[in-house]
Amino acid sequence: QQEFIDLKFLYVDSDSSVSYNPGFVTTKENLSSRIFKSIETYSKSPDINSFGGRLKYSKLLSVIDKVDTAITSNITVLKMRRDMVPAYGQLANYELCYANQFHADLEGFNIRSTSFKIAGVDGDVFLTDLPNSDGLTGVVRFFTLVDDVPNFINNNAGTVDYVKGEIILFAVNISSSSVTNKIEIEVIPESNDIIAKQNLYIVLDTTSGSKLTLLEDLVSVSYTHLRAHETHE
């Protein structure tokens, strides 16, 4: 008898700062478009799109670098995201598995979420984490923002297992969320090589979750002008 697995998506958001020599590209917009297209092509490759797929960080960097010889460097930061579907208006527990180890900065804020509302609490609520001193486990904390400063309203809203890559929320009555029908929960991975384990399927998000910043490499521009000057002497 065939067993049907409840497939869950593990989204990977990328934030890339790409330096380039503007003397070698037609327009900044054209370069940006080609970089996004290359990332999108990689996102659909068999490496990622399969059970047990793996997002290879070095491959992603290479994909960006190879778009144009004008690119001089790129710094790319990855984050993992699961979308939690709340049982609105009901007291419910939640479990989110990422199956990849979380980074555990002892100051916390390794986990971030979009906002939601809790019955009986005024204002928008967010969740984050605070690791225990061993960095292996920790707690989930709920907070609101007062003048852009976190105001913690629950310091024991759940547990975090940084090694397993697992978040558990204790019983909570979520009444609404800022994003339709879901709460996006983003985590910093310990390794930038992200593997689809268990019933997870990796999606390299090339839409709203990912960012691209293009920076003119002034050093390479100066070098190019210098070489051109030397050539004409």
Located regions from the model:
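Acidic/polar low-complexity flexible segments
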Residues: I194-V221
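Conserved small/polar residues in nucleotide/adenosyl-binding loops
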Residues: T224-T231
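An aromatic-glycine-centered, glycine-rich loop/turn in mixed alpha/beta architecture
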Residues: N30-G123, L127, V203, S222
